[in-house]
Design a protein with these regions (language model features):
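Active-site helix of classical SDR
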Residues: 15, 51, 59
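Residue(s) in the substrate-gating loop at a strand-loop-helix junction
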Residues: 35
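Active-site loop immediately N-terminal to the catalytic Tyr-X3-Lys motif
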Residues: 40-46, 68, 118, 136
Length: 156
């Protein structure tokens, strides 16, 4: 239940808080941050992927419902991003297997199918995508999902 609360219901609560002001202005942009795990579930976190799948679906519904009122809703779906969570996973692998950090990161990359760009993404790169999606330059973009994963997801 914690995965659902953190990865879906927190966004729903925030949206409920900000939507009245956006509706009053008849404009606004919401960007939800999902995860590539909704497309490729990870057995090590079985509730996380489904919660992110629900968030992605919820974003589509919100875009359709509030688009006529001038509110845009999009989803950003990161793959392997260098975060404290990714680092913690690498450290757990190091401890479990008694291997170096480089070996643990290589194991993580193999588990997710590799990253063609050869490195994890950065939080700054994800933030730049979000900034674009809330900007006027993206005024006609709504109901879309943007995968930012260095080419990892090869599914159409």
């Amino acid at each position: 239940m914690q995965a659902l609360g953190t990865n879906l219901l927190s966004a729903v609560r925030l949206d409920r808080a900000i939507l009245p002001g956006m509706l009053e202005q008849r404009s606004g942009a919401i960007v939800h941050v999902s995860s590539l795990q909704w497309k490729r579930p990870d057995p090590s976190s079985p509730a996380y992927g489904p919660a992110k799948a629900a968030l992605t679906s919820y974003s589509k519904v919100l875009a359709a419902e509030f688009g006529p009122m001038g509110i845009r809703v999009n989803t950003v779906t990161p793959g392997y991003i260098a975060t404290s969570g990714a680092e913690a996973r690498i450290r757990r692998t190091m401890d479990r297997a008694g291997i170096s950090r480089d070996e643990a990161e290589a194991e993580l990359l193999a588990t997710i199918g590799g990253v063609p760009l050869g490195r994890p993404g950065s939080a700054a790169e994800v933030a730049q995508l979000v900034a674009f999606l809330v900007s006027d330059a993206a005024a006609y973009i709504s109901g879309s999902e943007y995968v930012i994963d260095g080419g990892n997801n090869r599914v159409l």
